[in-house]
Amino acid sequence: MIEIDNLTKRFGDRTVLDDISLSVGAGEILAVVGPSGAGKSTLSRCVSFLERPTSGSVRVDGADFTRLEGDALIAARRKIGVIFQTAPLLRRRTVAQNVALPLEYLRATDDSVSRRVTELLDRVGLRDRSGYHPAQLSGGQRQRVGIARALALGPSVLLSDEATSGLDPATTKSILALLSHLREDFGLSIILITHEMEVVREIADSVARIDDGRIVESGSVTDVILDPTSALARELLPERPSVPVRGDAEVWEVSHASRHVPLDWLTSIQSVPGISGVQVDVLSASVEAIRGVAVGRAVLAISPAAPPGFADHLSARGLHVTSTAATARKTAA
């Protein structure tokens, strides 16, 4: 488990991180997102103690890194494995030799190194590439070697700093599946620093958005997405292109605000007394499963004569309804 409490980092008079507090339990994945320059990379360096925070604490399995110095800090940092955007592999070393590097620094026995390297290459699906050199590997395979090396010393926390950036979609998906399996197998606490919202949707249990060095929004991924007021939810579920509105219809945006929205919420309108005559046109809609919960958003064109009970009916079924000005969305007939 990793706990970050009131972490602040300053460079001279400039505050880059301001009072950051986050926690990730064993077997959990937290995604940290935000625009370029928001402080994500500095947070990564402070968590791994490549940079010492100005104030606050970073505790891993109860050990407060900010209270440690010298050899004690070096030993404690072994509890955090780091995966970088580009795996920094030594080109003259084989795959197995690259994975073995941290163990060799600790002067582990040859037998223990061999066993550990074989186990890790099995885990990342590269045992048959153990004698290859980095130049003989694909980008995804090199990243798998980096993951294996990050796990060599048996960390309890894995920090991924834009590890899937630049990979093609299929390779990204396979790397995320690997990380998900590893967190289950080893009980890892994983922090994903990323700008890719599909990564958050695919694998994260919780998410925090940093902007200008501060956390502006955080929570479980499903809770964030089901919050109709969340700006982060709109990034996680971007709007789909809509069919233009014609005539004098009113535009409503309908989004899931509950884990229990019935699948027939739209078709059921036709059977509700006093509402069945409402003309409803679907301009756009999307539904997907995230962490086992169906979430979605639809843009509807509603006839002007829609009774107040129509919105109440949708709200009662776990939906959030926002009426927007139709004029901006209309096109000439």
From Swiss-Prot:
Explain the purpose of this protein. Part of the ABC transporter complex MetNIQ involved in methionine import. Responsible for energy coupling to the transport system.
Please identify the protein, giving its name as recorded: Methionine import ATP-binding protein MetN
The coiled-coil regions, if any, are none
**Species lineage, top-down?**
Bacteria, Bacillati, Actinomycetota, Actinomycetes, Mycobacteriales
Instruction: Quickly give the catalysed reaction.
Output: L-methionine(out) + ATP + H2O = L-methionine(in) + ADP + phosphate + H(+); D-methionine(out) + ATP + H2O = D-methionine(in) + ADP + phosphate + H(+)
Q: Tell me the organism.
A: Mycobacterium sp. (strain MCS)
**Cellular compartments per GO CC:** plasma membrane
Q: Where is the ABC transporter domain?
A: 2-237
Supply the alphabetized keyword list: Amino-acid transport, ATP-binding, Cell membrane, Membrane, Nucleotide-binding, Translocase, Transport
- What's the gene? metN
Give the main localization category: membrane
